């Protein structure tokens, strides 16, 4: 994430992102996941199963459970409990409750469960990836993970996976084999989609440029793209001619400009361009 110098503006920016990401998740959960009884994905997956066995709706049970987990978080984690997680959990609970009251659904939006499964996977995954990228979470089973991490030596990933698997297995018996199979696909695809979205959110281009005259290229990087670079001297293994290597990293939109500029002013330059989704330092991810 780009650095924002003002603490106030940075806070506004981050909480704005949290709000948008939660709304994206809520749309996927409420309009696509709950009506089709897709029972994967932590608390919302568990709520889908519980709603079929009790008088609770999936939205109401999710809201109540998230609120209870918030209280447990304050009780067991105290000051270590993140405000971003509290805010995200409250926004999700309120949003689901409002949709339940003002936009009730009695059936899926379409007759294509596979299409709706794609949205039930993709939208929450995008929201989760955005939250993860700014160091927040949507609460739910994440709060359980925080408590387990503090008070036990249990493998948190295994515990959370078992919760997801239990919900999916229950869906076979409660909703039928077809819904159970869809839930299994959703569980398998969820993590892959989250990882893919996170990588693409942070994707940058890394340049290693070998050239004879570094000055115009460095000037363009600094003045034209507002980036910096590291320059070091090298020697060609075959020609033994002196060469200069320029190493720099930038966003994809800037990378295209730099590549075109180098082709125009230094056509003999050798460029090695690679992707990176985790660059830590000034101008990129915070330490």
Please name every model-derived segment.
Residues 1-5, 201-287:
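Peripheral (non-transmembrane) domains and long loops of multi-pass membrane proteins
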Residues 2-213, 224:
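Core subunits and conserved enzymes of cellular information-processing
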